[in-house]
A protein has these predicted regions:
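Conserved N-terminal beta1-alpha1 strand-loop-helix module at the mouth
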Residues: 1-64, 96, 153-159
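Active-site mouth loops of central-metabolism enzymes
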Residues: 2-15, 58-60, 134-147, 200-206
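Catalytic cores of alpha/beta
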Residues: 19, 23, 59, 64-78, ...
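Alpha-helix-loop-beta-strand connector modules within alpha/beta enzyme cores
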Residues: 40-74, 98-105, 127-131, 179-202, ...
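C-terminal helical cap(s) of enzyme catalytic domains, especially alpha/beta-barrels
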Residues: 46, 50, 88-104, 215, ...
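Conserved anion-binding
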Residues: 67, 79-156, 165-167
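Glycine-rich phosphate-binding active-site loops on the catalytic face of alpha/beta enzymes
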Residues: 79-93, 161-170, 219-238
Length: 243
């Protein structure tokens, strides 16, 4: 049996959706702030819903938007997914904005939710935040592939990599062909390098067959389709039963 953890992308900014994912027994949810207009006000109730259902929450932020790191971390979200990592400088940028000194230079405010609005011991808050917070660094292009060895060398302890197959396929001149042998081979190369270095790596798929393929490959975590896609497919299949 695979030990892969399975999560779903959340595009619909309603806490009930987060709770439903938790009730379904999935391992985590990924709130997508990159490909949706979701902002910090919409994120807050989603964070509360995830905590209520003891569901791990990942937030994917837009590319190189400094304020998003602060907004998400200050709401007490431990896992941030950063897209379009192509160079060591991109890794260093993500680390800088995700952690407090001495690891990074994240903006420090004690009067935020993550610090109990000023009621956590400040030294304990800083140390515990650095220990608890994690990064998921998203590789999704040929430039990132070309620099993968140096990127892996720069990955901080506790961070992981994620392979975005759709953007990777596009960068290879095969837009949308995420099962093309060249795309899969490129993904496998990253996976093998991560395994050698004992770095967790995840990927995305949008079919049950894809989940089976990558889970059998031993991928530590798989991000699947989206909440709305699941609903539409389930509703469509229901309609087919009465035709």
């Amino acid at each position: 049996m695979s030990d892969s953890k399975i999560g779903v992308f959340v595009k619909c900014p309603h806490p009930e959706m987060i709770e439903a994912i938790g009730i379904a027994g999935l391992d985590f949810a990924i709130v997508d702030m990159e490909h949706t207009p979701l902002g910090p006000r919409e994120l807050y109730p989603l964070v509360l819903a995830a905590e209520r259902r003891n569901l791990s929450l990942v937030v994917r932020i837009p590319f190189k938007q400094d304020a998003y790191f602060k907004w998400v971390r200050d709401l007490n979200v431990a896992s941030i997914q950063v897209p379009h990592i192509e160079t060591v400088a991109d890794v260093e940028y993500a680390v800088k904005h995700s952690y407090f000194n001495p690891i990074g230079e994240r903006g420090l405010c004690r009067f935020v939710r993550a610090a109990d609005f000023g009621n956590k011991n400040k030294n304990n808050y800083i140390e515990s935040a650095n220990n608890a917070n994690s990064l998921i660094l998203q590789i999704e292009g040929q430039t990132g592939m070309a620099n993968i060895d140096s990127i892996i060398d720069a990955v901080p302890p506790g961070a992981s990599l994620f392979i975005g197959p759709y953007d990777l396929s596009q960068s290879m001149g095969l837009p949308g062909e995420i099962w093309h042998p060249d795309v899969v081979d490129s993904m496998e190369k990253i996976i093998r390098k991560c395994e050698v270095r004992d770095i967790d790596v995840g990927t995305f798929t949008d079919t049950p067959e894809g989940v089976k393929f990558w889970s059998e490959r031993g991928i530590p975590f798989i991000q699947y389709a989206s909440d709305l896609d699941l609903f539409i497919k389930t509703a469509s299949n229901l309609k087919l039963t009465v035709k």
